[in-house]
């Protein structure tokens, strides 16, 4: 009971509610907001455009504890408050049913990329060019029928193709009104939504894109008609609880779409049961993801900062305004939780209460029906709902999790491997030695995933060269990947041109310390790793050198002293663990993680 009334929450004062009238501040934020505000006490790493992962903790918000961010947005984007207040019922069933019955928008309102409401983000009086360059003859090609769905930004109708390749076929047409495009940014959003639908259309769990048109009043997006309705309706129809086998079948489809668009460098930002549709009413209907209206490109070396999404599904780091693809994984964690137990993991009477809950409360895994749900399923959900985005599984990893592994339609390349390998090959020899020792202690389960990724990269003579990484990425590239500039990472992997990674070293390179640390066996793993390090990787290191290794300044020296053994000048166990973790002075001394 009381899913969100955890101990954490009850310590929060009630006066930090987000005032619902802080709407539409003209406040400007910029891409680096989070970094700049948290960098004051943390020395920055040498001038690279990369985000230093060690400097970013989801717990280092520039905001006071419990306070959700101000509505500062990407330039010109307004934050619309309040969105429909959540109903006080806890089980998703009742809450959703009520909302559907009453509100004109039957669903959880998204935290919108605002497109309605007066004013223009590009400056008052500016004339907006609402010409998209799309074809104009929609009416000549399609016959419009009844409405099949409605959202905040448009409505979707049934239609029939009158001519062309799909003549006679029924389709869905999302009609987006130009009158709602009141800023250059909202026009850009529609342009991007169409571009993404088109680029990602090939995947079996993406809705198929056919065509796009416009006239003076509307944009018409023609796509595959999904006649089975929304996943939300199906959740409501069966009382909100799925047997594990069925939950798995749904999640595998959600994750395989997500792994695909994440590999393209696209973050959806609005994953929720309303945005998944079944192709038919049949038992074996395929699930498709729709609505890329809030989606964006996620460059590998940048973090997004606009607070968008739907309150119940929004990840903590989104509220802290520094996030990337992991935010979608959190939303899938929320969906998983709902599928399995029928309740929301994070709940509150008001939007700010929901946000506090998301930031601080631990979801309830103790009350009914959780005792009857398998421990492995619970483990799965927990590894998606980790508040630290670095400790969360990726979509590709989630597909390889033992709970889902058997259902698996085939593993997908995980871009996070590229990021980790890139860091590894650019790291100091000392750090690489530390990681090599760690790789010898990786649990069997995690090795299964790494082996699969190794094979997907198609090693030659038992090892991976730079061109294997290039070829693999190219194989899966769509226009979206080009736009998100993920392949740029290959330039930073140049040191690999003269090297070959065998499986052992690949493991050292692509193991995520953060994820291992989230495991119950971490202590044990670190102990074994340290033994290896002692016998083959360690050497004496000075405090200064260690500080440099960790991109820390002289103010860290006193702390680092405790990590080095006076006996032989080598790292002690604590030092080794901290070094692996890459902890910042701030989070080690005053803000313990978790
Ligand atoms: N291809 C489709 N086939 C059948 N129904 C669809 C299709 N696309 C959309 N719909 C229906 O129309 C609804 C609204 O579509 P969509 O989510 O794309 O619009 P939106 O205005 O962006 O919504 P939101 O308010 O969630 O942002 C969907 O929830 C769904 O019920
Ligand atoms: Ca909707
Ligand atoms: Ca939608
Ligand atoms: Ca949308
Ligand atoms: Ca953006």
From Swiss-Prot:
Residues 408-438 are annotated as: Autoinhibitory domain. Residues 50-60 have a biased composition (Polar residues). The active site is at 270 (proton acceptor). Residues 142-404 form the Protein kinase domain. May play a role in signal transduction pathways that involve calcium as a second messenger. Ca(2+) 2 binds at residues 500, 505. It is found in: Membrane. This is CDPK-related kinase 6. ATP binds at residues 148-156, 174. InterPro entries: CDPK_Ser/Thr_kinases, EF-hand-dom_pair, Kinase-like_dom_sf, Prot_kinase_dom, Protein_kinase_ATP_BS, Ser/Thr_kinase_AS. CDD domains: STKc_CAMK. The keyword Lipoprotein applies. Residues 445-480, 481-516, 517-556, 557-586 form the EF-hand domain. It comes from the Eukaryota. Ca(2+) 1 binds at residue 461. Keywords: ATP-binding, Calcium, Kinase, Lipoprotein, Membrane, Metal-binding, Myristate, Nucleotide-binding, Phosphoprotein, Repeat, Serine/threonine-protein kinase, Transferase. It comes from Arabidopsis thaliana (Mouse-ear cress). Its EC number is 2.7.11.1. The gene is CRK6. Ca(2+) 4 binds at residues 566, 568, 570. A lipid is attached at residue 2 (N-myristoyl glycine). It is a lipid-anchor. Belongs to the protein kinase superfamily. Ser/Thr protein kinase family. CDPK subfamily. The modification Phosphoserine is found at residues 310, 352. Residues 34-49 have a biased composition (Low complexity). Autophosphorylated. Its main location: membrane. Gene3D superfamilies: EF-hand, Phosphorylase Kinase, domain 1, Transferase(Phosphotransferase) domain 1.
